[in-house]
Regions:
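Active-site neighborhood of phospho(di)ester-bond hydrolases with catalytic His/Asp-centered motifs
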Residues: 5-7, 27-32, 51-56, 81-86, ...
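A basic- and aromatic-enriched beta-loop-alpha substructure that forms the phosphate/nucleotide-
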Residues: 51-58, 63-123
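Active-site-proximal loop/helix segment associated with metal-binding centers of metalloenzymes
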Residues: 101-171, 176-187
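Short amphipathic alpha-helices and their capping/turn segments at secondary-structure boundaries
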Residues: 44, 82, 88-97, 154-166
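Binuclear metal-dependent phosphoesterase catalytic core
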Residues: 73, 77-78, 94, 184, ...
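Beta-strand-turn-beta hairpins that frame and shape the catalytic cleft
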Residues: 1-4, 88-102, 121, 169, ...
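N-terminal active-site segment of His-dependent metallophosphoesterases
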Residues: 1-52, 59-67, 132
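Active-site environment of divalent metal-dependent phosphoester hydrolases
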Residues: 10-15, 34-39, 57-67, 89-93, ...
């Protein structure tokens, strides 16, 4: 199956016209498409099915529990399937079955280990300062983000380790990155990187392909393990005004 991958388009702040990639059988949107949600209309009538995981900015200035069903309904009206802690099996043109396992996978701030967690959470003022989201009326701060992240992690681990519908390949889709290897090279191992990447390296062997967004840099690497190799790909556009979109490929396709 040939997948087109886009993320971090930030259509609420910069113009960008997405186009279908030649030969793609499916479009994957890995979050932060448009904080206003208006940009999802760009994908109405897309020539192939569209799967999406939400990004953190899809919740800017919103109440988390109210936003989830509203976003799912909005995406559905645009012909987009929003997935959150859901698995879905699709078949490609050759009849091969591909299982998609998807969640936003918020940051749990354990990227650098439990001893550095408090420092990483203090550095995560970003979530309150920029998002200004709420959860049950309270600020969606670092502690609340971690709570959601742990629930995502538990679900993801269960989905990848328990028998499910048989499939020829498994693709994980998250917004937050699964490894420090996907960290933005501009920031390296700063504490703030734990707001963008998780230490999900132990889950990588359970997938054939892992697609993510969130970091405004591109990544395409393989991780070798006893089961073989897992490919990790991020095709984040980022903000052109900051020079982040220079190597972004608007028609990138990934074969699985």
């Amino acid at each position: 199956m040939r997948l087109q991958l886009l993320s971090d388009l930030h259509l609420e702040s910069e113009p960008f016209d997405p186009v279908p990639a030649p030969g793609a059988e499916l479009l994957v949107l890995a979050g932060d498409i448009d904080s206003s949600w208006a940009g999802f209309e760009r994908f109405r009538g897309w020539p192939v099915p569209v799967l999406c995981v939400a990004g953190n900015h899809e919740f800017d200035r919103r109440e988390l529990h109210q936003a989830w069903p509203a976003l799912a309904q909005h995406c559905a009206r645009c012909g987009i399937r929003l997935l959150e802690r859901e698995s879905l099996v699709l078949r490609d043109a050759r009849g091969r079955s591909v299982r998609f396992v998807a969640t936003i996978r918020w940051a749990d701030f354990d990227l650098f280990g439990t001893t550095q967690r408090a420092k990483a959470m203090r550095a995560a003022s970003y979530f309150q300062r920029v998002m200004r989201a709420t959860q049950d009326g309270a600020p969606f701060d670092a502690a609340a983000v971690r709570g959601e992240a742990l629930a995502c992690r538990a679900w993801l681990h269960h989905a990848l380790t328990q028998p499910g519908e048989p499939a020829d390949a498994t693709v994980v889709i998250t917004h937050f990155a699964p490894s420090l290897r996907s960290g933005d090279p501009r920031f390296g191992s700063q504490s703030t990187t734990a707001s963008f990447c998780n230490a999900d390296d132990d889950l990588l062997p359970l997938a054939d392909l892992w697609l993510h967004g969130h970091v405004h840099s591109r990544h395409d690497y393989h991780v070798a393990h006893a089961r073989g190799r897992t490919r990790v790909v991020c095709n984040s556009r980022g903000l052109e005004s900051r020079g982040e979109a220079r190597s972004f490929d608007p028609v990138l396709t990934v074969e699985i």
